[in-house]
């Protein structure tokens, strides 16, 4: 069964797009999530929404607890994640309101924990291949 997780950025702090919404809080080994999870349906699809910057938009980008957020969505049974973000473009043909689906990225984040794999014991080291970071399905 497909369950879609949506990580909403700016503008999706308090979404009213879900049918039969309910709120759940999932404890994680990484601390608190940015917001409680909202579950419900959109056009018959099972959806879980998390507000990246908190419901009151009080969490700056560098302080978002990404590991807790991803862990909670997985624990809630999400099989797919769609993340929205508000950003600009360097290309004139991409304007306000356009939707862009990336197939690659450059990670310029700094000073944040960026892995779930913190132990470097023999046989336990994990690497995540990044040549194709997005699922094409």
Regions found by a protein language model. Name each.
Residues 1-130:
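Metabolite-binding pocket within alpha/beta catalytic cores that recognizes anionic/polar moieties
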Residues 131-137:
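Active-site rim beta-loop-alpha module in soluble metabolic enzymes
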